[in-house]
């Protein structure tokens, strides 16, 4: 949720953020109205309760002549308090709904606009000239790494098996990511992949995008699309110790996405699938440290991309393409030869205090006063990386060179066609 102090003191900042995202700025005015109504209702109910308490005390010391009128007054006040409390509950619910409807306020410098309005910050490496390149699925099938047909037979479209050295390649990639994280002070975690509704909502993944999330209705649990979700919930309703700097976690999990809005997109191969594996960095820090920590996450992502030896670029994602929780997001996109373009391999988001405010995660400032923490997240390795590895390292004879950093995990320097 956004900071109410900011909303009340400078609502135009929130309106501009909404416009940059392509969202309705009228939601800001609706929240201001709901906030005023809620505060008025609270004040009215408090005042009536105080009056009721005073009237009740007065009955005890009243004369027989005064008592009937005072009793009636106390009864009337009790009814007024009941009505005021009902109004307070209604205004609280309306306020919460209005508050939850507004996404995070973007940071200065984030490009306005939609999916195609990103800013390219850097291009790293030159795409290699490849005559008649094969796509990752053709390579994966010929090398015995990917089996889409049996994945579909078992689970339906957008499912797959990683087989043999394909499984080793992914496991090696994720182990490499986890090793990098641990070497940089992250605590490794294997979190639950099922979470309660309040945790999913707290991270900003419900609301307008609820249809993209798998839900187990009988158990009222959600399958996570990223380990960001359980790691954000890890310190819900807690005061964390940030006295020695940020808390950094690296979560390794399977991830599940319905891809409800992607019909017809990336139907071939493993670029867009319902289940994949990922190592995700997640950070709790003070709001003052958040922007510097965002740059650190990006640097660690770049270090991982250097390990797989592929050309990539870094983009500053436009406001309209940000998730509800993100105030700023950087994507690293790797070159995909058969598509002649760059595709996202990593993202890192600065969620400022948005998630922690929803999840009641705080820290103590220098004066010992509890304050809302900031949260950030960033991909360190995921299944989709195999697409870029296979396509960029393919050889004329149909083999694929294994990046040096992964050779020890896969057990060979070259993946050879089967049969």
Swiss-Prot record:
Disulfide bonds: none annotated. It is found in: Cytoplasm. InterPro entries: aa-tRNA-synt_IIb, aa-tRNA-synth_II, aa-tRNA-synth_II/BPL/LPL, Ser-tRNA-ligase_type_1, Ser-tRNA-synth_1_N, SerRS_1_N_sf, tRNA-bd_arm. ATP binds at residues 257-259, 273, 344-347. Pfam families: Seryl_tRNA_N, tRNA-synt_2b. The keyword Aminoacyl-tRNA synthetase applies. L-serine binds at residues 226-228, 280, 379. Its main location: cytoplasm. Keywords: Aminoacyl-tRNA synthetase, ATP-binding, Cytoplasm, Ligase, Nucleotide-binding, Protein biosynthesis. Its EC number is 6.1.1.11. It catalyses: tRNA(Ser) + L-serine + ATP = L-seryl-tRNA(Ser) + AMP + diphosphate + H(+); tRNA(Sec) + L-serine + ATP = L-seryl-tRNA(Sec) + AMP + diphosphate + H(+). GO terms for biological process: selenocysteine biosynthetic process; seryl-tRNA aminoacylation. One of its GO terms (molecular function) is serine-tRNA ligase activity. The keyword Plastid does not apply. One of its GO terms (cellular component) is cytoplasm. SUPFAM superfamilies: Class II aaRS and biotin synthetases, tRNA-binding arm. Pathway: Aminoacyl-tRNA biosynthesis; selenocysteinyl-tRNA(Sec) biosynthesis; L-seryl-tRNA(Sec) from L-serine and tRNA(Sec): step 1/1. Catalyzes the attachment of serine to tRNA(Ser). Is also able to aminoacylate tRNA(Sec) with serine, to form the misacylated tRNA L-seryl-tRNA(Sec), which will be further converted into selenocysteinyl-tRNA(Sec). Homodimer. The tRNA molecule binds across the dimer. Belongs to the class-II aminoacyl-tRNA synthetase family. Type-1 seryl-tRNA synthetase subfamily. Consists of two distinct domains, a catalytic core and a N-terminal extension that is involved in tRNA binding. This is Serine--tRNA ligase. The lineage of its organism: Bacteria, Bacillati, Actinomycetota, Actinomycetes, Mycobacteriales. The gene is serS.
